[in-house]
């Protein structure tokens, strides 16, 4: 029997080590059991990677993180090549251990008090007009990291007054009142929080999270700021059905959410949850039609869609697939 892992502060636990810390049993996927990727899931990498390396260098220079890299996003090459990135604040170690996610788990160090200024300067240097700020979960902080979000928003707006800011926030488990008090005082231009999947598979997919809690977070922010769009996203391919996805869409509309993203789940490693199915582009188109009929102002639905994928276009209501 292997010895239990004793977490050390500041150490990233990934793949097998991360999965060993999850209370929900997950069987390692053997290579022969992996679903073969269909043709529509194949990505063509850009021939020139200089822009990609430039963004990575800027991140390293300023001690910043992107969720694009930390979560192994399949769109990294496309987005970096177009000069866009989703910044991940509060470090690169998450206090949660969701078995679909490639972000490292562990005991994080204290937040970097200089991060808001470094982030704001980097964004100004890149001359960005739209930026997405997300974070790891920080259950170790009394406000779940809400004040750090607010500090980042304020610093960014001071250096880039005309910029649009979207926040993709964690669920602030057990800290909703405190977090919302802070965030409603310094609101973003778009408030995003992902449900990730359907309630039936939450125990397996999002251990430690609560479906109704997440809906309430979205609803309460919307009540405080009726004119600010709220947004949520789901991954498909984790054992849910299309009918269950559509029911979640109805729940989101009942809680005031107006923007939706649906994308295909991809297994980061064989230690993570396996892909149960690949949803076809036609099925994504059908779910988008359902979403628009329900009253969503925008729905980005497609195999490679992620919450922050072409987020500026999503906010303008432009077509994203």
Swiss-Prot record:
SMART domains per record: Elp3 (SM00729)
SUPFAM superfamilies from the UniProt entry: Radical SAM enzymes (SSF102114)
Pathway entry: Protein modification; protein lipoylation via endogenous pathway; protein N(6)-(lipoyl)lysine from octanoyl-[acyl-carrier-protein]: step 2/2
Co-factor binding comment: Binds 2 [4Fe-4S] clusters per subunit. One cluster is coordinated with 3 cysteines and an exchangeable S-adenosyl-L-methionine.
Listed PROSITE patterns: RADICAL_SAM (PS51918)
Coiled-coil blocks: none
Record GO terms (molecular function): 4 iron, 4 sulfur cluster binding; lipoate synthase activity; metal ion binding
Domain Radical SAM core residues, every copy: 80-297
Cellular component terms (Gene Ontology): cytoplasm
Enzyme Commission number, as recorded: 2.8.1.8
Binding site residues for [4Fe-4S] cluster 1: 68, 73, 79, 308
CDD domains recorded: Radical_SAM
Catalytic activity: [[Fe-S] cluster scaffold protein carrying a second [4Fe-4S](2+) cluster] + N(6)-octanoyl-L-lysyl-[protein] + 2 oxidized [2Fe-2S]-[ferredoxin] + 2 S-adenosyl-L-methionine + 4 H(+) = [[Fe-S] cluster scaffold protein] + N(6)-[(R)-dihydrolipoyl]-L-lysyl-[protein] + 4 Fe(3+) + 2 hydrogen sulfide + 2 5'-deoxyadenosine + 2 L-methionine + 2 reduced [2Fe-2S]-[ferredoxin]
Residues the record lists as binding [4Fe-4S] cluster 2: 94, 98, 101
Compartment(s) of residence: Cytoplasm
Top-level taxonomic group: Bacteria
Main location group: cytoplasm
Enzyme class, UniProt record, top EC level: transferase
Cofactor(s), by name: [4Fe-4S] cluster
UniProt keyword terms in alphabetical order: 4Fe-4S, Cytoplasm, Iron, Iron-sulfur, Metal-binding, S-adenosyl-L-methionine, Transferase
Listed PANTHER family: LIPOYL SYNTHASE, LIPOYL SYNTHASE, MITOCHONDRIAL
Family per record: Belongs to the radical SAM superfamily. Lipoyl synthase family.
Protein name in the entry: Lipoyl synthase
Organism: Enterobacter sp. (strain 638)
């Amino acid at each position: 029997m292997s010895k239990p892992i004793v977490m050390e502060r500041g150490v990233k636990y990934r793949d097998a080590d991360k999965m060993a810390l999850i209370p929900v049993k997950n069987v390692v996927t053997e290579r022969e059991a992996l679903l073969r990727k269909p043709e529509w899931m194949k990505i063509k990498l850009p021939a020139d990677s200089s822009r990609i390396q430039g963004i990575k260098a800027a991140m390293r220079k300023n001690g910043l993180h992107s969720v694009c890299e930390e979560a192994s996003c399949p769109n990294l090459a496309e987005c970096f090549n177009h000069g866009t990135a989703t910044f991940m604040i509060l470090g690169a170690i998450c206090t949660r251990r969701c078995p679909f996610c490639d972000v490292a788990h562990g005991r994080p160090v204290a937040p970097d008090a200089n991060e808001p200024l470094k982030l704001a300067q980097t964004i100004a240097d890149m001359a960005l007009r739209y930026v997405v700020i997300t974070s790891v979960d920080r259950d170790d902080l009394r406000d779940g990291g809400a004040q750090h979000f607010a500090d980042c928003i304020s610093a960014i707006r001071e250096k880039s007054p005309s910029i649009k800011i979207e926040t993709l926030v964690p669920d602030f488990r057990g800290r909703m009142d405190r977090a919302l008090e802070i965030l409603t005082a310094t609101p973003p231009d778009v408030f995003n929080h992902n449900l990730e999947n359907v309630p039936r598979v939450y125990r397996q997919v999002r251990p430690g999270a609560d479906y109704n809690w997440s809906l309430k977070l979205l609803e309460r922010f919307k009540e405080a700021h009726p004119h600010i769009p709220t947004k949520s996203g789901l991954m498909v391919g984790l054992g849910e059905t299309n009918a269950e996805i559509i029911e979640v869409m109805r729940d989101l509309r009942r809680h005031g959410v107006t923007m939706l993203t649906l994308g295909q789940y991809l297994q980061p490693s064989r230690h993570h949850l396996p892909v149960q199915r690949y949803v076809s582009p036609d099925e994504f188109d059908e779910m988008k039609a359902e979403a628009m009929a329900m009253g969503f102002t925008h729905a980005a639905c497609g195999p490679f869609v992620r919450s922050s994928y072409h987020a500026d276009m999503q906010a303008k209501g432009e077509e994203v697939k």
